[in-house]
Amino acid sequence: MKVSVPGMPVTLLNMSKNDIYKMVSGDKMDVKMNIFQRLWETLRHLFWSDKQTEAYKLLFNFVNNQTGNINASEYFTGAINENEREKFINSLELFNKLKTCAKNPDELVAKGNMRWVAQTFGDIELSVTFFIEKNKICTQTLQLHKGQGNLGVDLRKAYLPGVDMRDCYLGKKTMKGSNDILYERPGWNANLGVLPRTVLPRTVLTRTVLTWTVLP
């Protein structure tokens, strides 16, 4: 997980850039716990009183990339790095569990994005940025292989529960498969089979597993 330090306000949730960076870096545990406590005290009002013990554990595991209970090997078969795939999926799982403890789950938002890593080979970096109370907390990334044949990026068994994918439009590329113009097919925008530029509410993506591969 990488923290979005560049361009971040001087303070975020009453924490300095350096504090946030240390929290998700390989710092000493006592320093990490002290910083985490400050984060928790700032955020605890967002969670129901009877859920705060659970929320505390989930938030700690989330910011420290702890492994969850989900079997990551079942998803994102096109991932280049298995360890990054596990971190990516577990971060999503923990964040969604954290939302169930919140008084207003809409204040915890995950936004997806994609960018071309190498035009020649078609690899794409998929990223999800996590926000709490509109503050950017961190970004998790996953690099994906080119799909089978001429089919853009490999999104077989993609796992994006609760992620807002509306910013995933990559533009009209010239890549084609057979006689079809791929950007005119459903899935070009990672919008789950709807037409390009359609706006999706976040609820549409809850617990969704994508099975198509077309996303050039």
From Swiss-Prot:
Additional note from the record: May be missing up to 80 C-terminal residues compared to orthologs.
Name of the protein this chain belongs to: Protein YabP
Organism, scientific name: Escherichia coli (strain K12)
Taxonomic superkingdom: Bacteria
UniProt gene name: yabP
